Swiss-Prot record:
Organism this protein belongs to: Synechocystis sp. (strain ATCC 27184 / PCC 6803 / Kazusa)
Residue stretches making up the 2Fe-2S ferredoxin-type domain: 4-94
Assembly, per entry: Forms a complex with heterodimeric ferredoxin-thioredoxin reductase (FTR, ftrC) under reducing and oxidizing condition and thioredoxin. Interacts with a number of proteins including RpaA; binding to RpaA is higher when ferredoxin is reduced.
Disulphide bridges, residue numbers: 19-86
Co-factor remark: Binds 1 [2Fe-2S] cluster.
UniProt keyword terms in alphabetical order: 2Fe-2S, Disulfide bond, Electron transport, Iron, Iron-sulfur, Metal-binding, Transport
Keyword Isomerase: no
Name this polypeptide is given: Ferredoxin-1
Entry-linked PROSITE patterns: 2FE2S_FER_1, 2FE2S_FER_2
Sites where the protein binds [2Fe-2S] cluster: 40, 45, 48, 78
Gene that specifies this protein: petF
Sample GO molecular function, one term: electron transfer activity
Highest taxon of source: Bacteria
Cofactor needs: [2Fe-2S] cluster
Keyword Iron among UniProt keywords: yes
Length: 97
């Protein structure tokens, strides 16, 4: 099992967390004491949306984002596993529309 450093850029500042490749980024952030937005926790809405600016994730469990949004770097943190060290800007739901 690999572990990666995930840098989260929130409206309140930056935080770096460790996240294993079998843990959703939202879950790891909560375990680290960060308060990120979420609703369904199933990849079926956009409340937890963020934008990845470096690195990569596996969000194959998501069912909300379309191909263009994924291509643009949007990620649903509730169903995203890190596949490398990565940087994600959180609180991006409004930018999807």
């Amino acid at each position: 099992m690999a572990s990666y450093t995930v840098k989260l850029i929130t409206p309140d500042g930056e935080s770096s967390i460790e996240c294993s490749d079998d843990t959703y980024i939202l879950d790891a952030a909560e375990e680290a004491g960060l308060d990120l937005p979420y609703s369904c926790r199933a990849g079926a809405c956009s409340t937890c949306a963020g934008k990845i600016t470096a690195g990569s994730v596996d969000q194959s469990d998501q069912s909300f984002l379309d191909d263009d949004q994924i291509e643009a770097g949007y990620v649903l943190t509730c169903v995203a596993y890190p596949t490398s060290d990565c940087t994600i800007e959180t609180h991006k739901e409004e930018d999807l529309y």
